[in-house]
Swiss-Prot record:
<dbReference type="InterPro" id="IPR041709">
    <property type="entry name" value="EF-Tu_GTP-bd"/>
</dbReference>
<feature type="binding site">
    <location>
        <position position="26"/>
    </location>
    <ligand>
        <name>Mg(2+)</name>
    </ligand>
</feature>
<dbReference type="GO" id="GO:0005525">
    <property type="term" value="F:GTP binding"/>
</dbReference>
<comment type="subunit">
    <text>Monomer.</text>
</comment>
<keyword id="KW-0378">Hydrolase</keyword>
<dbReference type="Pfam" id="PF03144">
    <property type="entry name" value="GTP_EFTU_D2"/>
</dbReference>
<feature type="binding site">
    <location>
        <begin position="76"/>
        <end position="80"/>
    </location>
    <ligand>
        <name>GTP</name>
    </ligand>
</feature>
<dbReference type="InterPro" id="IPR027417">
    <property type="entry name" value="P-loop_NTPase"/>
</dbReference>
<dbReference type="InterPro" id="IPR009001">
    <property type="entry name" value="Transl_elong_EF1A/Init_IF2_C"/>
</dbReference>
<keyword id="KW-0251">Elongation factor</keyword>
<feature type="region of interest" description="G4">
    <location>
        <begin position="131"/>
        <end position="134"/>
    </location>
</feature>
<feature type="domain" description="tr-type G">
    <location>
        <begin position="10"/>
        <end position="201"/>
    </location>
</feature>
<dbReference type="InterPro" id="IPR004160">
    <property type="entry name" value="Transl_elong_EFTu/EF1A_C"/>
</dbReference>
<dbReference type="GO" id="GO:0003924">
    <property type="term" value="F:GTPase activity"/>
</dbReference>
<keyword id="KW-0963">Cytoplasm</keyword>
<keyword id="KW-0342">GTP-binding</keyword>
<dbReference type="InterPro" id="IPR031157">
    <property type="entry name" value="G_TR_CS"/>
</dbReference>
Length: 391
């Protein structure tokens, strides 16, 4: 099946497969590429290259494909630990996920953990593929598994009753052995993904935010802060807030430059220098953010989901306990914080993923779903994401 070049005119959505080991995530990924992309064999996807995100090595396979309506980038991870790390670090951002559940086994421990993680890290929506239906002869049993999956999703605050569940066999699709549960099911799955997973809001359409990386003073012109615009647009003449570390202050952007050229605006993805009115060199520092007034607030206390590196990954060799005080690296700077473990958890071992309470010593511009690294003296020992802000 010859395919032309991907047209970038369609809306772009990032998705991934999640679910228990051996339930068929990689086979399903291969089957989708067979009908909607450049066909990748199972073993081509399974031999996933390693990449680094926030100082953590993760194996992820990336494939792309398109339906009539959208272009998709799809991530599949070979090992369970890779999923945990990927979801917490956001190495491959997911706008939605396809949960793969074997009809023969029903939901298993990693099914539960991936759904919980998806909730914690804010994967907005899930579509279910009930795989290996050819291994179940009893229609009632199939119905039971479907009910169990819906209950599990509802328990984790996903709309379990409304989520599309497509039944099929990834293997049948790959082997062309049964069109109904093979090709037809894969096409039905992608139709549901198209319809049910919303197109994400582009960074450009969100309110302006830029983490400050550096501060310069230019004689006769004032103070310039540099950084990469994370989202939104800033126009010359707009009022902005400087947030984090110190009390929030207001300023006006009197100039934007990029590659030494003056522009009338800077937008998401641009590396810019912003000239600020009425701010002296000492009034602003790396680690603060520049943002549209009233859109983001500084916070110190939050609940986080975190993954702690193993010794082999370059992490700690020993467990830690309540009152552990590492640095939390948010956007461009380290801030010391105190960790409190949940009741009943005595210690955290390298390789664990956990939910913890954190209190920073100074406030940082923070929103739910903001990601961070956990460091000790500049060495990454973990990664996390803000789940809930407390104050």
């Amino acid at each position: 099946m010859a395919k032309g070049k991907f047209e970038r005119t369609k809306p772009h959505v990032n998705i991934g497969t999640i679910g228990h080991v051996d339930h068929g995530k990689t086979s399903l990924t291969a089957a989708i590429t067979k009908y909607f992309g450049e066909y990748k064999r199972y073993d081509q996807i399974d031999a996933a290259p390693e990449e680094k995100a926030r100082g953590i090595t993760i194996s992820t396979a990336h494939v792309e494909y398109e339906t009539a309506n959208r272009h998709y980038a799809h991530v599949d991870c070979p090992g369970h630990a890779d999923y945990v790390k990927n979801m917490i670090t956001g190495a491959a951002q997911m706008d939605g996920a396809i949960l793969v559940v074997s009809a023969a086994d029903g939901p298993m421990p990693q099914t539960r953990e991936h759904i919980l993680l998806a909730r914690q890290v804010g994967v907005p929506s899930i579509v279910v593929f009930l795989n290996k239906v050819d291994q179940v002869d009893d229609a009632e049993l199939l119905e039971l598994v479907e009910l169990e999956v819906r209950e599990l999703l509802s328990k984790n605050e996903f709309p379990g009753d409304d989520i599309p569940i497509v039944k099929g066999s990834a293997l049948a699709a790959l082997e062309d052995s049964n069109k109904t549960i093979g090709e037809d099911a894969i096409r039905e799955l992608m139709a549901q993904v198209d319809a049910y997973i919303p197109t994400p809001v582009r960074p450009l359409d969100k309110p302006f935010l830029m983490p400050i990386e550096d501060v310069f003073s230019i004689s006769g012109r004032g103070t310039v802060v540099t950084g990469r615009v994370e989202r939104g647009v800033v126009k010359v003449g707009e009022e902005l807030e400087i947030i984090g570390i110190r009390p929030t202050t207001k300023t006006t952007c009197t100039g934007v430059e990029m590659f030494r050229k003056l522009l009338d605006q800077g937008q998401a993805g641009d590396n810019i220098g912003a000239l600020l009115r009425g701010v002296d060199r000492e009034g602003v520092e790396r680690g603060q953010v520049l943002a549209k007034p009233g859109t983001v607030k500084p916070h110190k206390k939050f609940v986080a989901e975190a993954y702690i590196l193993t010794k082999d990954e370059g992490g700690r060799h020993t467990p830690f306990f309540t009152n552990y005080r590492p640095q939390f690296y948010f956007r461009t700077t380290d801030v010391t914080g105190i960790v409190s473990l949940p009741a009943g958890t005595e210690m955290v071992m390298p390789g664990d993923n956990i939910t913890v309470d954190v209190e920073l010593i100074v406030p940082i511009a923070m929103e739910e779903k903001l990601r961070f690294a956990i460091r000790e003296g500049g060495r990454t020992v973990g990664a996390g994401i803000v789940v809930t802000i407390k104050e």
